[in-house]
Amino acid sequence: MDPLEALQKHVQRPEEFPLREVTVSGISYVAFGDYAYKKDTETSLQIYGKSDEFYSLESLVVFLKYSHENHGVYVKEAAAAGVRAVTRIDRKNVTEYLQGDRTDFPALMNQVNPLSLRQLLHSSEPEAKKPRLDGEAAGEPMDTSTSDEPQESAVSAAKKEVEIRALNDNLTKDRIAEMRRKRQSHREKGIVTIDESLSTLTSASLPKTRIHKTRENVMLGARDLSNVLDIITSAQRQWDLNEKKEKVAAVHATNLSKDQSGAAGGQQQRSGYSRYAQEAFAHEKTKEIQTEGSFIGSNFSSIKQGHHAVQKAPDAPPGRPPLAKPIQLLTSSTATSSGSSAAQNGSKRTSRSPIIIVPSAMNTMINLYNVRDILQNFSYVPVDQRRKETNKKPVDLAIQRQKNGVTYNIRVIDNAEKLANDDWDRVIAVFVMGVAWQFKGWKWNGNPTDIFTHIPAFHFHVDQDKPVAQVMQWNVHKIPVSATKRHMDKARFSQVWETIENFVRKNKPHLTARLGL
């Protein structure tokens, strides 16, 4: 069998012809099953452009080992092994021949007869391990006569027992012979047939194996409890905030009681310095400048005493209108009283922040979990990933938009039913998921066509898939999002803000200041 043919059979049937490299008497051999060849044996594959040079068996074995790598890596490995590398031109032809796709290579080399691997390994054993079965070693003369049955004479000569001599009185020749026969019978009964290809198969598959359990991951649990640390951190932050509020409330209560006691007794005792009660002494630093007052009709003493000793201005002459009454500057104490009175009257501050509505479902590409990553950080993060990292779903979210070095807040909600009629005037964008029930309870009777006429709408979809069929019928901006190319997110999401800003300039100019336009 030609070495190239043996290598081809190994590629096609590796279990029947396993590859094995052995060294016998300092000579390296490549064995395919029981067929062994020297490593430097030349094959019938001719090198391209050189009619008198052929690839050696070792070169093809190295090529077969690194055939899955690119050509540059293979050339480095071949140079490290000290063999000739298969050229890039011959690479495809050699691969097709080894896989059996081509058989048209000319047989230019003489066929090399293989050696038996078992005989090579047997010949390499030391003399002490070889069984002495020949008659000459046993001291018996060899029969040199010719016979018609040489096979029977060889078998009979192999079956002759080795000369046995007694060692002592207890271990006689008969005793030693009996022990040898008993040992031989035990060996024959205990023989287990072992496939010689198992060792080669194990060595070939060892680089591809992966350790499933190690001493570290075997102690890991099946549940992911990493979010427990986030829960503890948020709870600790809330505890610190509550403790700080309690301290501030205690200081204010102490100062208030001291002020009341001082006013009742005609004396006011000033409390010690506290960093939590800075507002209690703010009225001492406030300058009561009466910008709309007048000094006409006042004397120097009244001016020096301030508004506590303001005297009644003299009556104006009949031909002159009365002077305007000086207005006191609003101090911290008056501001506090006015704020408390406003709170008692039930007045509520009206929000002026723009509003963006996102879907509330979990099977969408955008909702309250990842809207900050998309519209503020310009990076797409899947909803499931952000959901695992977040303790609970945010109810009302505020994202920040940087414009000309100024930060603007935009409110994001997923429940449009709680919006009043005035709030709908501040809605600047809607993100749709492709179903009509999303707009149930919305303004304009929940009609998607009317909603998209008054508010710009956007729909995110994977760039490899088409948008939902229902979305294709709506006036919606389709934004494709790549599943792997995160560097394209900023350009895609910037288009969303550009569309929103153009809409606000044209249709809602009262919100331009809220977006820095």
Curated annotation (Swiss-Prot):
Key words, A-Z: Activator, Nucleus, Transcription, Transcription regulation
Transmembrane spans: none
Reading the lineage from the top rank, the first entry is Eukaryota
Q: Where is the composition biased (Basic and acidic residues)?
A: 124-135
Q: Which GO terms describe its cellular component?
A: Cdc73/Paf1 complex; nucleus
The entry summarizes the disruption phenotype as follows:
RNAi mediated knock-down is embryonic lethal. Embryogenesis proceeds more slowly, with embryos displaying defects in the positioning and shape of epidermal cells. 60% of embryos arrest at the bean stage of embryogenesis without any significant change in body shape. Nuclear localization of rtf-1 is unaffected.
For biological process, the GO terms are: positive regulation of transcription elongation by RNA polymerase II; transcription elongation by RNA polymerase II
Ranges for region Disordered:
124-159, 306-326
Kindly list the places in or outside the cell where this protein is found, as annotated in its UniProt entry: Nucleus
- Name the principal localization, coarsely classed: nucleus
Output the Gene Ontology terms for molecular function.
RNA polymerase II complex binding
Feature: compositional bias, Pro residues: 315-324
Summarize the subunit comment.
Answer: Component of the PAF1 complex which consists of at least cdc-73, ctr-9, leo-1, pafo-1 and rtfo-1.
Q: Any idea what job this protein has?
A: Component of the PAF1 complex which is a multifunctional complex involved in transcription initiation via genetic interactions with TATA-binding proteins, elongation and transcription-coupled histone modification.
Family per UniProt? Belongs to the CDC73 family.
User: What is the name of the protein in this document?
Assistant: Cell division cycle protein 73
Q: Which organism is it from?
A: Caenorhabditis elegans
